[in-house]
Amino acid sequence: MSVRQHWRVIAAAAVTLAVVTGCGSDGGDSAAKSGDAATRVFAADNGDITIPVAPQRVVATGYAVPVLIEADAALVGISSWKRGLALMTEQDRATYERLPKVAGEAAAETNYEAVAAAKPDLIVIGVPKPALGSIDMKRLESIAPVVAIGPTTPAAWRELSRRQSDAAGRGTNFQAAKEAYEKRAAELKDKYGAALTGLKFGHVGSYGEIAKGTFHREFAGSWGTNIAQDAGVTYYGEVKEKGGGGLDVTEYPAIEELPTSLGEADAITYTVQPDGTPAEAVKQVLDSALWKNLPAVKAGRVFGLQYTEAATYESALRTLDSVDKAFAPLLAR
């Protein structure tokens, strides 16, 4: 039985239990009975919000979109999420295409009339706190309870997705996906443990700017690194100056700084696109003479990783599969 099939077997029972008991989340949220619907108080980025225990009509935006699609939440509307389409399974992509779009890619592109027409009993906003300023929160709150649960640092997607799933009444589904991911990560850690022992890794991400002559250096806890870390990879170093959020774990040095930035690396991973090819910003690094002279490159310890922007446990399984495929040559050494 697949993780998704398992979810469907237990989802109805879990929701029924939640309504009967009016239980709070594992975060200690309180619960109460209001009219015919059980409610609880949920701690969100925008404060303590009273929400249904078992939401029946959910609108999701931003990072909450893939999370709640995977969790089989009772979605009636979502924002556009084109950046994550390549990470979706065929089943999730079909769900994404079927659902009404009530907002664009940016928070400012919220269609309030479309949100109201969806008649939600819960709205889950999955955008960073600074982006909330682009949303008319009072207008949304006049439609349904609104919980803002947005990203902070790249590796925080684990807790972010847990909270979003919890708000939508799908905590059990989330747990099943989490356990499947952790099992796979443990398998890879065991499989490659000996080969990875003692190796210091660096990572090149895909957001360098060719026009400015910079490359994207990612450290532990960044998009390109955090999932590989769960498989046993150790990334060394840190940013010169923390800038908050993702800038705490990533920086953009000039390409001339490649020897300084990655010269101590025993091995290097780099982000590739879903089709396995590097984006232009990565290709400019790989084509550089400075890159070719790095010790890790000369030693043949460079590995392209797909799906490094995964922000859900289900999609991160694809990242782990890519890690497994990329590291296979290490076992032949």
PLM regions with names:
Residues 61-114, 118, 122, 126-129:
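A short, structured surface patch at a secondary-structure boundary
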